[in-house]
A protein has these predicted regions:
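Conserved AMP-binding/adenylate-forming core of the ANL superfamily
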Residues: 2, 21-64, 71-72, 89-94
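Conserved AMP-binding/adenylation subdomain of ANL enzymes
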Residues: 193-230, 234-276, 291, 295
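Structural core segment of the AMP-binding/adenylate-forming
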Residues: 48-49, 79-151
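Conserved pre-ATP/AMP-binding loop-to-beta segment of ANL
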Residues: 152-173, 180, 216-226
Length: 550
């Protein structure tokens, strides 16, 4: 039987609808036929350079069609691509390339200045391929991506001597804000199974019976998904959304210049008649709503029926605001991580709404206490969210972290990245936050996310970040960094009282620091190490043995 790999599915789709658009960006259109030819050329180049079965390919670029083609070429040749965070400095990039055992590096030419000082210490890299961009030329030590992609081999599609297998890997580097980055190892066959083999319950689409059926379905589907992607492809949310659209015979819509800007997002959605959109929670949804509020009626969004989010909190008030402007839209809020897809999901539309951080527990999911007991619905206990079934193999070259994140309970293996939650009597899961960020103040556990969400409900607060700093008496005390809406100056006492009106009094921040920006990463996530450093620099020395935790 044909293996469940991205390459096998995408080749089937490309053969069925070669002239349709696979990827668009600005005015640029890449057809399925063009994507197929370029990926074959990349696959042939990787093999000629000496890469072997499951050799690793690093893709170090902003959002662009070449990003997807670089991965596709790797999938064709039975190789294992992985992502590189383009915000990293030289030593961070060197660590990641070394830890990932990169043998090929595909990169934006604008990052040549980062790679040049470290490439001499990367003897395992057999080929460097640069994507030329505006104002950036290909360095003399790298090959031009366009030149490589133009060398389309006569024998196609390209398949390596070792073939393709369900066990072929996709590596997703994650976790750089709380320690060194780690690569999550997903087998492609498990990813396909986790995604229901192309099934879509919302549309009543059944699962595929084989990879070859993907092309038949794409040919027979009159209105294919057109998916506008806001977050970086270098993170799992954007990457998997793009891969899903291509596998369904749809079009991936990337924003011009490769970076998120709310007006450009809505421009692209309207221009290409997007049917779906992918964001990362409130950090993307808030500026998107602000753009709609500032420009009522500017964009025709009548084709947009679904917006999906994963990776960050997305509050109820924002969802209702988006629905006011796009009344037909379904807002699908998924609680997932690179290690654990599908921990929970909520759906908000004009007919009904979900509370912030409230989800229906996903299939094959559970909550376990620290001693391995299953948390029963309505018990009031909290524990770590766990996903069973199709889960990653673990972290690449990190058996200790693999053992702690993928434990065995009740005789089966689970993925437990560290998200704490409770489950109510009706089965609704309430997310508390990531355990690694938990603040212990006077013996009480406080999760930053719940305080952040409470602060963001204040009309003067655009965004917020919460951390703990050492306290001689109570262990830690809570500090909030608050990013206000333009033209307002939040009052610290008012904000503290605002939190006390929603949460236990000990969860109210002891100090509120008004900042220009909480400095979220491009994927919408907070760098809690940097936030703690900012709080310590401002208030750490002042927090001695005074004041209580409540």
């Amino acid at each position: 039987m044909t293996a469940w790999t991205y390459a096998n599915i995408w080749e089937s789709v490309a053969a069925a609808i070669p002239d349709e658009a696979a990827i668009v960006q600005g005015d640029r259109v890449v057809s399925f036929a063009a994507m197929e030819a370029q990926a074959d050329a990349l696959a042939a180049h990787y093999l000629k350079a000496g890469l072997g079965q499951q050799s690793k390919i690093a893709v170090y670029a902003t959002n662009c069609p070449e990003f997807i083609v670089a991965y596709y070429g790797g999938f064709k040749a039975g190789l294992a691509p992985f992502n590189v965070n383009y915000r990293y400095g030289p030593e961070e990039v060197r660590y990641l390339l070394d830890n990932g055992d990169a043998e090929a590096v595909v990169f934006d030419a604008e990052f040549a200045s980062i790679l040049d000082p470290i490439r001499g210490r990367m003897p395992g890299v057999k080929t460097w391929i640069a994507i030329a961009g505006a104002g950036h030329i290909v360095p003399d030590w790298a090959e031009d991506f366009d030149a490589v992609a133009a060398r389309v081999p006569a024998k196609r599609p390209v398949v390596a001597p070792w073939g393709r297998h369900n066990e072929d890997l996709l590596l997703i580097f994650t976790g750089g804000t709380t320690g060194m980055p780690k690569a999550v190892m997903w087998q492609q066959g498990d990813l396909m199974a986790k995604g229901g083999y192309g099934a879509n319950p919302l549309l009543g689409t059944p699962p595929l019976g084989s990879p070859e059926e993907a092309g038949e379905r794409a040919r027979a589907t009159p209105i294919k998904p057109r998916s506008v992607i806001a977050p970086p492809l270098m993170h799992a949310t954007g990457l998997i959304a793009a891969f899903t659209a291509i596998g369904a015979g749809g079009t991936v819509i990337l924003l011009p210049h490769g970076k998120f800007e709310p007006d450009l997002f809505w421009d692209a959605a309207a221009k290409w008649r997007a049917t779906r959109a992918t964001i990362v929670g409130q950090p993307f949804a808030q500026p998107l709503l602000e753009a709609l509020e500032a420009n009522p009626g500017k964009w025709d969004l009548s084709s947009l029926f679904m917006m999906g989010s994963s990776g960050a909190m997305w509050n109820r008030e924002n969802k209702l605001g988006l629905i006011r402007h796009i009344p037909q839209i379904q807002l699908m809020d998924s609680y997932s991580s690179s290690e654990a897809f599908g921990m929970g999901i909520s759906n908000t539309n004009a007919q009904g709404e979900s509370a912030t951080a409230a989800f229906a527990l996903g299939p094959d999911c559970a909550i376990f206490t620290e001693d391995g007991r299953r948390v029963e619905a309505g018990s009031g206990e909290s524990g770590r969210l766990a996903v069973g079934g199709f889960i990653p193999l673990g972290y690449y070259k990190d058996p200790a972290k693999t053992a702690s994140t993928f434990p065995t309970y009740e005789g089966k293996r689970w993925s437990m990245p560290g998200d704490w939650a409770t489950v109510e009597a009706d089965g609704t899961v309430r997310i508390l936050g990531r355990g690694s960020q938990c603040i212990n103040t006077g013996g009480e556990k406080v999760f930053p996310e719940e305080v952040e969400e409470a602060l963001k409900r204040h009309p003067h607060v655009r965004d917020a970040a919460v951390t703990g700093v050492p306290d001689a008496r109570f262990g830690e005390r809570i500090v909030a960094l608050v990013e206000p809406h333009p033209g307002v100056a939040p009052d610290e006492a008012e904000l503290r009282d605002h939190v006390k009106g929603q949460l236990a009094t000990y969860k109210s921040p002891r100090h509120v620091m008004v900042v220009e920006s909480v400095a979220r990463a491009p994927n919408g996530k907070l760098d809690y190490k940097a936030i703690k450093d900012r709080a310590l620099a401002a208030f750490g020395a002042a927090f001695g043995e005074t004041e209580g935790a409540a």
